[in-house]
Amino acid sequence: MRRAALWLWLCALALRLQPALPQIVAVNVPPEDQDGSGDDSDNFSGSGTGALPDTLSRQTPSTWKDVWLLTATPTAPEPTSSNTETAFTSVLPAGEKPEEGEPVLHVEAEPGFTARDKEKEVTTRPRETVQLPITQRASTVRVTTAQAAVTSHPHGGMQPGLHETSAPTAPGQPDHQPPRVEGGGTSVIKEVVEDGTANQLPAGEGSGEQDFTFETSGENTAVAAVEPGLRNQPPVDEGATGASQSLLDRKEVLGGVIAGGLVGLIFAVCLVAFMLYRMKKKDEGSYSLEEPKQANGGAYQKPTKQEEFYA
């Protein structure tokens, strides 16, 4: 009895999983026009009552199932050994809990390895950051023809109890050496250059030239020492003058310009001379209106009277 009830329950479950879909078949469907000659539709009866209604029929699928298809064969559990077992564990850092809605990472542990060992292999060493002390030095340079005053004072953000000393560096030492720090109070160093002397840098400072001075202050400003003789001269556009001078300096270009001018002058003189010649010939020429008559068999005879027309 119990076995029969089990079979009935399995049959009902199988029928519920496969819903019966009604199959709709159109009976009154006109055949397809293969030759394409039929222009009128065949859906009308021709009696004037309108289109014929379509007749639809539904076919329900059969509900009989073979019983022998639903037999279930029990299977024995597969033997498992302790060596081939795999443990699935979720690895989370200490003090953290998985939130709702977030996927949990499952790590498959192999024999002889743990999830912690894999984490150690993945993690990289943190980069070491070294903070270097940066001291800013503010300086003002005044360029004059007579004297130059250089004032160096400590920055407002420097530590109290320290003072800054400036000393010329050697040629082999870099330009941006840190200032020497000594104990004691703050002090201000002022240097005044005598009249008539130029503002020169010690050997090794700057960019290697004596005309430019590069200060290593916080703003990275560059101050150029201007010579007194070149201060009042207007700026010269080197791009415009350089192109014209380069063309005129070449002998081939200069010779071509001179030759072209001479040829043009000769051609103009010849044209004017030809025009004057034509005008002069028209003024001097004379043309007779009647031809002289020849007598005595065509012998030459001086005409007695001849009318002349002056053009």
From Swiss-Prot:
Subcellular location: Membrane; Secreted; Secreted, Extracellular exosome
Membrane-topology annotation of the record: Single-pass type I membrane protein
Biological processes annotated in GO: canonical Wnt signaling pathway; myoblast development; positive regulation of exosomal secretion; positive regulation of extracellular exosome assembly; receptor-mediated endocytosis; striated muscle cell development
Keywords linked to the UniProt accession: Glycoprotein, Heparan sulfate, Membrane, Phosphoprotein, Proteoglycan, Secreted, Signal, Transmembrane, Transmembrane helix
Region (Disordered): 29-59, 152-184, 285-311
InterPro entries membership: Neurexin-like (IPR003585), Syndecan (IPR001050), Syndecan/Neurexin_dom (IPR027789), Syndecan_CS (IPR030479)
Chain ranges passing through the membrane: 256-276
Glycosylated residue positions: S37, N43, S45, S47, S207, S217
Gene Ontology molecular functions: cargo receptor activity; identical protein binding
Record site: Cleavage: A243, S244
Highest taxon above the source species: Eukaryota
Extracellular-side segments: 23-255
Post-translational changes noted in the entry: Shedding is enhanced by a number of factors such as heparanase, thrombin or EGF. Also by stress and wound healing. PMA-mediated shedding is inhibited by TIMP3.
Bias kind Acidic residues: ranges: 32-42
Protein family: Belongs to the syndecan proteoglycan family.
PANTHER family according to UniProt: SYNDECAN, SYNDECAN-1
Entry function: Cell surface proteoglycan that contains both heparan sulfate and chondroitin sulfate and that links the cytoskeleton to the interstitial matrix. Regulates exosome biogenesis in concert with SDCBP and PDCD6IP. Able to induce its own expression in dental mesenchymal cells and also in the neighboring dental epithelial cells via an MSX1-mediated pathway.
Subunit structure of this chain's protein: Interacts with CDCP1. Interacts (via C-terminus) with TIAM1 (via PDZ domain). Interacts with MDK.
Protein name stated in the entry: Syndecan-1
Natural source organism: Mus musculus
Name of encoding gene: Sdc1
